[in-house]
Amino acid sequence: MATTTLTKSAATVLLAHTQCATATVTIGSAVDVSTKLGPATAFVKMGRTVSNALGNQVRFRLEGSAKTSGNDEWVPIYEWQSLNGTTAASKTTLNDAACDAGDTSFTLTSGTGFTAGDLIYLRETGTPANSEWCRGKSTSTNTVTIEEALTRGHTNGIDVTDLAELFAIPVDTSGHVRIRLVVDTASAASGQTVDVIAWLVTVDSASTA
């Protein structure tokens, strides 16, 4: 029986880690998909930066272009918005001087409001790209245990919030030349800064043997 093997491009940057202030439109990198095969997935992460509820949900657009250059042919492929933005988040600081890559737990100044299943955002402002999203498994007083080990170590004292959001958006690249992500906190002002990062995984080729 023949087996088809797909060759993929992993983690192409749609939007580098960006602090998206209220009342702004943030436009990510235009990714050339002219030679890609059909299926692709956009992976989008949003982290809260304050405990306050947002004034409005954050809006997202995946856009496609029929041209190899220029800005006059971008059209929406798919639009969505955050789910928990208008709910107040739990926010505290990391109180763990030995929070290292590979750790499966860390200590907070206050564990109040952090519960099992929470999507947690550890916000690095010195080197924003070192920020990290993780999922809580349990909380005991001020110690949070997470489902998977941390990828990076984290700076003691950084802000930590819950109610982060993760999205995986399937898209067919076969009818597009370029794809990009737009984060819109202007059409309906979010009132607060949110941090967003996004990647695209595409299929480059398929071989059957």
Sequence positions of predicted segments:
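C-terminal interaction-tip segments
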Residues: 1-17, 36, 183-209
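Tryptophan-centered short beta-strand motifs
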Residues: 24, 30, 70-80, 130-133
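Contiguous beta-strand segments within globular domains
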Residues: 26-47
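Noncatalytic modules at the cell exterior or secretory-pathway interfaces
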Residues: 38-44, 171-192
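Short beta-strand/loop motifs in extracellular/secreted proteins, especially
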Residues: 40, 56-60, 118-120, 132, ...
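Extended, low-complexity, turn-rich repeat/linker tracts enriched in Gly/Pro/Ser/Thr and Asp/Glu
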Residues: 46-57, 68, 128-129, 185-192
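Terminal beta-strand-rich extracellular "head" domains
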Residues: 58-88
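Small/polar beta-strand repeat architecture
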Residues: 84-104, 109-118, 123-173, 183-188
